[in-house]
């Protein structure tokens, strides 16, 4: 297992999308799951395309994050702040406020990118609800396919 990662399960083979999640402590699971479903809908992908839910290691026991992983029937992976901060240059929405609290400039986007791998791109940039954030990362080819589909629909 890579340095900085904690995971109770291995990932599903063959799928490529990683859902990065961040939330305040004690955020209702329903809020996080609804936001996660919105991220998938925004990307135009099915829940079955998801292979992993990822977040900051400080949220490794957060019921809402674990509930989201269970809801989508995928494992959860948690990364330390230094691992997420290594992705800062790739974040679409870095936040100094998030950095002050967590030690990294983005939890949802950073976790999605780390979980999806070095060649991954953000498919859905950070979206927010009252108490949570979500982002989706995966292969660059998927983002290109979605752009082509959107252009063809016009």
Swiss-Prot record:
Tell me the pathway: Cofactor biosynthesis; adenosylcobalamin biosynthesis
Q: Which UniProt keywords apply?
A: Cobalamin biosynthesis, Porphyrin biosynthesis
| GO aspect biological process, one term | cobalamin biosynthetic process
Q: InterPro entries, from UniProt?
A: CbiG_hydrolase, CobE/GbiG_C, CobE/GbiG_C_sf
Q: Which SUPFAM superfamilies match?
A: CobE/GbiG C-terminal domain-like
Highest taxon of the lineage: Bacteria
Coiled coil ranges (UniProt) are none
Q: What is the designated name of this protein?
A: Protein CobE
Q: Which organism is it from?
A: Sinorhizobium sp
């Amino acid at each position: 297992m890579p340095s900085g990662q904690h995971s109770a399960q291995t990932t599903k083979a063959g799928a490529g999308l990683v859902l990065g999640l961040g939330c305040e402590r004690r955020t209702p699971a329903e809020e996080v799951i609804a936001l996660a479903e919105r991220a998938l809908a925004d990307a135009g992908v099915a829940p079955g395309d998801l292979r992993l839910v990822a977040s900051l290691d400080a949220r490794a026991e957060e019921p809402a994050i674990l509930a989201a992983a269970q809801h989508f029937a995928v494992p959860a992976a948690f990364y330390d702040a230094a691992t997420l901060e290594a992705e800062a240059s790739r974040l679409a929405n870095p936040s100094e406020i998030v950095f002050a609290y967590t030690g990294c400039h983005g939890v949802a986007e950073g976790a999605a990118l780390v979980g999806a791998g070095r060649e991954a791109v953000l498919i859905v940039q950070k979206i927010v609800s009252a108490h949570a954030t979500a982002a989706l990362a995966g292969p660059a080819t998927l983002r290109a396919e979605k752009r082509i589909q959107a252009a063809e629909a016009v």
